[in-house]
């Protein structure tokens, strides 16, 4: 691959350092003289391990540190490229608790590549592992962390707009942060503070849906511009999903996706908070009432919301010892293929069987532009296969197998979902 030609395409920025620390480069990358597919000078590209909303995910390895990484790839000719924007948002977020490290951004052949740290399983994967119900203690430990996580994102002038269990991951097993809940995938994030005027974005209506229908706020269903309040309401819906095992608006049938989203929104509005939170501590209802009453421009009282749950946590006599429901169950590790707990596969299979339609139609809303597509489960995505040239040697089979059971910080689809499109 002609590296000099690549240099002409983009202006030079920062090169990835040998240490593997964060860098942004326009250095042409691809097949090295040794026939290994590379991203930047450090990162060897391995096998495909999944697909995200807008591209493909590869296993990678930092040749200087021997650490495994995740490499997110997006075709340069994508109709709505967003990987560079996501990279910018990650840089804007910096090194906060529960924010994955980004090691590198630059071209890789006909693709843009972002290199991130590997993390552990998602909350959805762990939910499957735990018979699709979490205890109150586990939900509270998750909730307290995620309120802080969302507060941090908001403090960087971003709203997240993509709350779902698949986007929250624990750390890599064996890592010191393995019990920390991380937030990933900022492809749908948006600046709610205008970088030029330093003012809050204006209130608007008739907006296209952005987010995941199951968890998004009622106001999002109504076509209202999202702000900080909507991220917190979506979290509240997710907390109740974990406690209840399902939500009242799951499994609704409709002739078209648009009608289905309408039904989901109607059912959310028609379900009283008291009914949604019935048989659970009052604090769950108090949380939802508070976030639904917030004004579009209003800064949420994160301390109040955290205190709701920390007080309940203390009153129940719990200890914040990170003893989640999944502790003691067999999880993947980065040092070898570990036999999966049979309960995970059986629970997942049973769930997929009884909820097949519901899962396939609980869509992720894409940030690409286009029309509703009811047939193509990858409509609006850039999921074209990335194939190494025949002379390129990808990571060897043995090493790849050691980490193929690892989840990584860019959520890859465990279930393909049909998409609808939105305009920013």
From Swiss-Prot:
Tissue occurrence: Expressed in both the striatum and the neocortex.
Residue stretches of biased makeup (Polar residues): 359-385
InterPro entries: Casein_kinase-1_gamma_C, CK1_Ser-Thr_kinase, Kinase-like_dom_sf, Prot_kinase_dom, Protein_kinase_ATP_BS, Ser/Thr_kinase_AS
GO biological process: Wnt signaling pathway
Binding site for ATP: 49-57, 72
Post-translational modification as stated in the protein's UniProt record: Autophosphorylated.
Region described as Disordered: spans on this chain: 1-35, 337-390
Location in the cell: Cytoplasm
Reactions mediated catalytically: L-seryl-[protein] + ATP = O-phospho-L-seryl-[protein] + ADP + H(+); L-threonyl-[protein] + ATP = O-phospho-L-threonyl-[protein] + ADP + H(+)
Regions of compositional bias (Basic and acidic residues) in chain numbering: 1-16, 348-358
The entry's keywords: Acetylation, ATP-binding, Cytoplasm, Kinase, Nucleotide-binding, Phosphoprotein, Serine/threonine-protein kinase, Transferase, Wnt signaling pathway
Miscellaneous notes: Triazolodiamine 1 is a commercial name for 5-amino-3-([4-(aminosulfonyl)phenyl]amino)-N-(2,6-difluorophenyl)-1H-1,2,4-triazole-1-carbothioamide.
Subunit structure: Monomer.
Function recorded in the entry: Serine/threonine-protein kinase. Casein kinases are operationally defined by their preferential utilization of acidic proteins such as caseins as substrates. It can phosphorylate a large number of proteins. Participates in Wnt signaling. Regulates fast synaptic transmission mediated by glutamate.
Protein name stated in the entry: Casein kinase I isoform gamma-3
Species the sequence originates in: Mus musculus
